[in-house]
């Protein structure tokens, strides 16, 4: 299946679910289709902080800690892939490469994968269906 590169277009408070946010992902280009993904408040905050480069939290957020750990272990995130939707739940994988060149694939919630992707500036893809 074809992987389509997408970007984070924004975050919006979800009127339907208390404490939930919609992460708005979109294709690149003029006729960009949008993909809303419902995420939790903590994940929305983490993504917002990472997108707004001028904000520096006084202590590392969870995704900052993950990034720091991967950096110390010599592992680089190469891409994020949102690849499945089952019963209203999206599934994602984080593709990384360790210092020995081995590819690693981690199962992830899309919100966590995107929070890491925006921190390390790696591409985000969705499978065409």
Task: Spell out what each predicted region is.
Residues 1-129:
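Divalent-cation
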């Amino acid at each position: 299946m074809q992987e389509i590169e997408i970007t984070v277009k924004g975050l919006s408070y979800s009127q339907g679910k208390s404490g939930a946010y919609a992460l708005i992902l979109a294709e690149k280009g003029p006729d960009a289709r949008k993909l809303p993904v419902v995420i939790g408040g903590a994940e929305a905050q983490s993504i917002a902080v990472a997108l707004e480069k001028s904000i520096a939290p006084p202590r590392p957020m969870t995704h900052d800690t993950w990034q720091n750990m991967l950096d110390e272990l010599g592992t680089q995130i190469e891409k994020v892939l949102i690849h499945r939707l089952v019963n209203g739940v999206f599934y994602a994988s984080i593709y990384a490469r360790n210092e020995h060149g081995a590819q690693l694939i981690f199962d992830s919630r899309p919100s966590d994968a995107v929070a890491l992707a925006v921190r390390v500036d790696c591409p985000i893809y969705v499978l065409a269906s």
